[in-house]
């Protein structure tokens, strides 16, 4: 076994990883995504090394899913984010990560700003230029 000074910690930006993993590897269940993350970290740890590296811990940093109630201006109704599919998926994903050996979940805090709907820059530009109408917007 490697000595303490030879062990490696891996830090994962959870928000970035989730978006990139979904783009690169497609939709997965929370358990499959947790397995994928662990395997990905182990492959990265040993890539390009003649010696097998020793993992100290994987630190996964992410904010807990939002529980806010926000107004959807297109549907003209309140949306409880705590009851969303994304909230359920994130909660199950965090639970799956916590069951993994050598994985530590570090949760940040949700920003007090946010929690409102925002238009993508290209959509806003099209609205201002008259190439799109408010009625054409969808969720």
Predicted regions mapped to residue ranges:
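Domain-level signal for Mg2+-assisted phosphodiester chemistry and nucleotide/NA-binding surfaces
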Residues: 1-139
